[in-house]
Amino acid sequence: MHPQVLIAGAGPTGLTLALDLARRDIPVRIIDQATEFFPGSRGDGIQPRTLEVFEDLGVLDAVLTAGSPTPVMRAYFGGEFAGQRRMADPVEPTPAIPYPNLWVLGQSRTEAILRDRRPHCPAAASSSSQRR
């Protein structure tokens, strides 16, 4: 199967696009300038709408298992404890908004989950991933 789409960038956006196209039987090829996968993180927050996309792609369970809700933060003023709270108050899901809260998961782990899903999508699995 020859790729019909070339995706520049093997980060979360490129991998998400590859999975979405592959499930539509559109073969892709992903290229990336990096020579290896970045082990750190450039972004840890996954937005609610992205969680909906991940559900649609079949990776949501892995993302929810690997990540966590936003952590509690503590504030200190003049060396004294002033209080603690979450970055945002949790919101209850509704049928219209099933995932209303930010989810915390490092980018390298998100990328690994998306890469692990590629073998389940023949059009993505048959494409080549070139890293230079």
Cite the ranges covered by each PLM segment:
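N-terminal Rossmann-like FAD-binding beta1-loop-alpha1 element of flavoenzymes
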Residues: 2-30, 35
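N-proximal short alpha-helices
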Residues: 23-27, 36, 83-87, 91
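Residue-level detector of anion-binding/catalytic polar loops
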Residues: 27, 60, 124
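Conserved beta-strand scaffold positions in the cores of enzyme catalytic domains, especially
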Residues: 30, 102, 126-127
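Active-site-adjacent segment of FAD-dependent monooxygenases/related oxidoreductases
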Residues: 42-119
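A short helix-to-beta-strand connector/capping loop
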Residues: 118-126
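A conserved short coil-to-beta-strand element within the FAD-binding core of flavoproteins
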Residues: 128-132
